[in-house]
């Protein structure tokens, strides 16, 4: 079961999502984090911090777990 991460907007970038999910401490860490960890968005590898995530998307992060974007 994926951990729900609530957003108040229509979409959020992957970099913003990592901070909101408490995976990273600051937005500046996103580029480094994505280069060092495998991240799957809807079961597809993605390392773009600007990747747009919408409600229903599932983000899996090796070593951190699975998260789902919700309203």
UniProtKB/Swiss-Prot annotation:
<feature type="domain" description="S4 RNA-binding">
    <location>
        <begin position="12"/>
        <end position="69"/>
    </location>
</feature>
<keyword id="KW-0694">RNA-binding</keyword>
<comment type="function">
    <text>May assist in the assembly of the 50S subunit.</text>
</comment>
<protein>
    <recommendedName>
        <fullName>Probable ribosome maturation protein RlbA</fullName>
    </recommendedName>
</protein>
<dbReference type="GO" id="GO:0003723">
    <property type="term" value="F:RNA binding"/>
</dbReference>
<dbReference type="InterPro" id="IPR036986">
    <property type="entry name" value="S4_RNA-bd_sf"/>
</dbReference>
<keyword id="KW-0690">Ribosome biogenesis</keyword>
<dbReference type="GO" id="GO:0042254">
    <property type="term" value="P:ribosome biogenesis"/>
</dbReference>
<dbReference type="Pfam" id="PF13275">
    <property type="entry name" value="S4_2"/>
</dbReference>
<dbReference type="InterPro" id="IPR014330">
    <property type="entry name" value="RNA-bd_S4-rel_YaaA"/>
</dbReference>
């Amino acid at each position: 079961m994926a951990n729900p991460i609530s957003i108040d907007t229509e979409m959020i970038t992957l970099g913003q999502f990592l901070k909101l999910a408490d995976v990273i401490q600051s937005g500046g860490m996103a580029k480094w984090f994505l280069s060092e960890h495998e991240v799957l968005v809807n079961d597809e590898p993605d390392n773009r911090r600007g990747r747009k995530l919408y409600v229903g998307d599932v983000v899996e992060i090796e070593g951190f777990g699975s998260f789902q974007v919700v309203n």
